[in-house]
Regions:
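Juxtamembrane intracellular "pre-TM" segments in multi-pass secondary transporters
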Residues: 1-4, 187-218, 400
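Short amphipathic helix-loop junctions that connect adjacent transmembrane helices
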Residues: 28-45, 233-250
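Central cavity-lining transmembrane alpha-helices of secondary-active solute carriers
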Residues: 50-66, 257-268
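Conserved MFS/SLC helix-loop-helix module at the cytosolic interface between two early adjacent transmembrane helices
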Residues: 60-97, 274-277
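Structural signature of the two symmetry-related core transmembrane helices
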Residues: 77-92, 171, 281-296
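Cytoplasmic helix-loop-helix junction between adjacent transmembrane helices
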Residues: 105-143
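Intracellular juxtamembrane helix-capping segments at the cytosolic ends
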Residues: 115-127, 319-332
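Symmetry-related core transmembrane helices of the 12-TM Major Facilitator Superfamily/SLC fold
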Residues: 166-183, 372-388
Length: 400
């Protein structure tokens, strides 16, 4: 059995490569469509929507299947599968010559998804119970750091070598991730392998009969929806606050990245707090303070004030996912980790699909400022629901 610290160090590198490889490409896909693939400016919004949503659609369907296969045949093989298929999809992305081919590449990418759930499943099986919060907080912090680093690398590489080169770099790092799994990560132990629970033949539908896990899946979908509500209009909103200033694109990217910087710092601290105070309590607090922060974020009329709220949002929000992942780990049997994180990923993908649609509708009907207050209402309602459901009652693990 591997030392959990070694596993955490390797997975940290893995997650960093995975995160920045994704974010150094995704923000620039509309530019890739127009500059490299010849899409007309009037059609770019339509093609951007098709290209983005195609991945979510496939990954939503496949995530529970990959999770079930991981529990049956091992987490390591599924992680390797995801790394290599993602590497192939990025490589193909650098070769495409039409928007239709790019859509097919994104479909392949959706088929390949599942690396993050496998990272979570492997870490929760290796981590000591008393270090679970620290490990998941560290992983979330690194994921956030990669999401900040990615657009910076993507912009630099695109300026120097063109956008196609960025796809090949991403393919290289995902292939490197696959090699790390092949040579350095051992299949995690399965404490329940010979346990009587195996006789129960648990299915993914059993999760929906467990109130706590069902509620956490719903919470995961809501949180992801809130994240993506703002995505279609955030850069436009920042531009409207900035006005006519030099280096507008650079300034916009800097302001957006502030929440990622603060989140990378705060996530491990939230994880430690969850270990001491209880993850459900920390989840509730983090959602509540984020809801307050989103309401405040809709108030500033200057870029400087908005930048301060953006940094604060990262501090508040970064406690949500580590707590959510830890709750799922604590209340799931060891031989069900792959499936539960696959289901959580599916719930989050559904939120990812709903968020941009809702954000676009709100911005069109009520204006961009309304988005912040709707996000606040959703988050505050979720925090009150969690508080009244689990106040003074931190459920003990019940394995169906």
């Amino acid at each position: 059995m591997m030392n959990w610290k070694v596993v955490l160090a390797i997975l940290t590198c893995n997650i960093l490569f995975m995160s920045f490889s994704y974010t150094m490409l995704i923000p620039f896909l509309p530019l890739y469509l127009t500059d490299e693939l010849g899409v007309l400016p009037g059609d770019v919004h339509l093609w951007s929507g098709i290209v983005f949503s195609s991945t979510f659609l496939v990954s939503t369907i496949m995530a529970p299947i990959w999770g079930k296969l991981a529990d049956a045949h091992g987490k390591k093989p599924m992680a390797i599968r995801s790394c290599l298929f993602l590497s192939l999809s990025y490589f193909c992305g650098g070769l495409v010559t039409s928007p239709e081919q790019l859509t097919l590449m994104r479909l392949l990418q959706g088929f390949a998804y599942g690396l993050w759930p496998m990272d979570l499943a492997i870490m929760t099986l290796y981590a000591p119970e008393e270090k679970l919060g620290f490990c998941l907080g560290t992983m979330q912090g690194v994921m956030t750091a990669g999401s900040v680093l990615g657009p910076l690398l993507g912009g630099i590489l695109s300026d120097l070598f063109g956008m196609r080169f960025s796809f090949f770099i991403a393919a290289f790092f995902l292939f490197l991730n696959g090699l790390m799994f092949i040579f350095f990560i051992k299949e995690p132990p399965d404490p329940g392998k010979d346990d009587a629970r195996k006789e129960h033949h648990l299915t993914q539908l059993d999760v929906l009969r467990q109130p706590l896990l069902r509620n956490m899946l719903l919470c995961g979908a809501l949180i992801q929806m809130v994240i993506f509500i703002l995505q279609p209009v955030l850069s436009t909103y920042i531009t409207s606050l900035a006005g006519d200033i030099p280096n507008l694109t650079l300034t916009t990217g800097f302001v957006i990245s502030l929440s990622g910087v603060s989140g990378a710092i705060a996530a491990p601290l939230w994880g430690k707090a969850g270990q001491k105070k209880g993850f459900i309590r920390i989840l509730t607090i983090s959602i509540f303070v984020t809801g307050i922060g989103e309401a405040l974020q809709g108030l500033p009329s200057t870029l400087a004030a908005f930048s301060l709220t953006q940094f604060t949002i990262g501090l508040c929000f970064s406690g949500i996912n580590p707590a959510l992942n830890a709750i799922m780990a604590q209340h799931t049997p060891p031989d069900f980790k792959g499936r539960i994180y696959g289901l959580l990923f599916t719930a989050q993908q559904l939120g990812s699909m709903a968020g941009p649609l809702l954000g676009g509708i709100l911005a069109t009907w009520w204006g961009m400022k309304s988005i912040f207050f709707v996000m606040s209402v959703i988050l505050l309602a979720a925090s009150f629901w969690l508080y009244y459901t689990y106040h003074n009652r931190d459920p003990k693990p019940v394995w169906f």
